[in-house]
Amino acid sequence: MHILWFRRDLRLSDNEIVTIAAADLKPVLPCFIVDPWFYEQSEVGKARVRFLFESLENLDQNLRQLGSRLYLFEGNSTTILQDLAKDLLQQGIRPKLFFNRDVQVQYGIDRDRAILDFYSQHNLECHLGLSSFLQTKGDRRDEWFNEYYTYQRQPLHVAPSRINTPQLSFNLPQLTFDDLKQKYKKFWLKDSTYFRGGETQALATLDSFLKRRFHGYHWKLSRPWLAQQGATSHLSPHIAFGTLSTRQVYQSTKARVAELGDQPLAEFSLKAFRDRLRWRDSFTQRLYYYPELAHTNHYPEFDDYYSPQELDPKKQELFQAWQEGQTGFPLLDASMRQLKTMGWMNFRMRAMCATFLCINCGISWHHGARHYMNYLVDGDLAIDNWQWQMQAGITNPLSDTFRIYNPNKNIEDRDSDLKFIYYWVPELRGYNLPEILSGAYIDKSEYPSPVLNWAQTRKVNGKIVSDMRKKVKQRLLAEQGEEYEQAAIAKKAVDKYWESKDKQYQEYRNKQAGSR
């Protein structure tokens, strides 16, 4: 009996463990474990759990079309899998466990190790697969780039046409989907849902993006209103839960470019999109090497300044204004309100809101990261918490600069027609762009005055962060150890990325000029 343990790989297509476990119609037991520990965490957002449950429902529907079904067990994952193996052994069935690697914090690392140890002690086989690219043998970051593209170009795993799941009974806590909705109903209470879960929806979303929505992606992705309307892929929650693989997306975009023929602008947009996929997987790889980075500063020089400790009353007041979208900075507040309602923001707004909290408010990224994870439908520790450290000015200390976004300048650059601000901050609908930029609304509307002086806090707090970065750089240069080598590799990767972006843009302009 092949136990097929789904986790963040909730799909049948291009799923290594599904293809191998179901081969030759061997008996397969597909299962998902609803672990109460996960749903009790403060960082678990309702939008994300609802998306997960919808994805499980769709996975069950797709399995039933192949003659199978999804078993929902409830309890501690380690205990359930151990008890399931014992139950099958008592029935005279030797199970083999199939599951994909998932980059985890310490809880998940310990859980997977305990499960593998149990199966080894009982002379039971395990097959550990990959749901997306990950270097798992040794530290070969200098080879990561080439290995990543080799993986993405490999043939997709073909979904089986039938899955043989015998009728079995188990003395284990199980749930039906009706049970799931009733027992965890707090995650289903929201009426409107902006992102629907499931492999079927993932494929439809990818199809609509590649057919029409991708046009102009390279510049629309940083415009929050256009991104909200579908100018970005909206695939991030699907990739986070594995209802779609990055390899499927990569190969589909390459096929679309070939289908379109000589269209430089389309090719440029889709190349920009594929680059984002690579960055996403590189963040996952980093957490695999350094799981502690999910909760600790990358460099100890920042530990006194960026701490998860409870905020003092003044900073707590700033933090609450930031959370509620009541800072008096219109674009920032629109973005934070969008997050609470949709469970999503485009990348530029996530970064802008993060730098404002960390640099201008002087509040640790730990607090902001928890808030994001409470609401993001696509929340992923590997990406989100590393991005928070980037926006806090912690990463890439060998570079002499770090970004601090100006919320008002970004109104001119990213929302000059004010559609995004008017939608999320209706208090300002009576004001035009010059009036909003000049603060004409202050003390004349229900909208709050700015909670801080942006220019002053940028200067003062920006210098504090800059000085800490210099200390890190000086130490790394003096030590010339592994930390320095990794920092140098990181800086080289960032520099190479921007060089490649410049090169791609120049190639696009040359092709565009040649086609006239």
Question: What are these regions, as identified by a protein language model?
Answer:
Residues 1-69, 466, 475, 479-482, ...:
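N-terminal beta-strand-loop-alpha-helix module at the start
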Residues 12, 38-39, 81, 105-108, ...:
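Short catalytic/ligand-binding loop motif for oxyanion handling, primarily in non-cytosolic enzymes
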Residues 12-18, 80-84, 111-114, 223, ...:
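Short alpha-helical segments and helix-capping/turn motifs at coil-helix boundaries
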Residues 69, 77-200, 204, 389, ...:
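Beta-rich, aromatic/charged-enriched effector core domains that present basic-aromatic interfaces
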Residues 143-301, 415-516:
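Glycine/tryptophan-enriched, flexible segments
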Residues 231-425:
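Active-site-proximal binding-pocket segments
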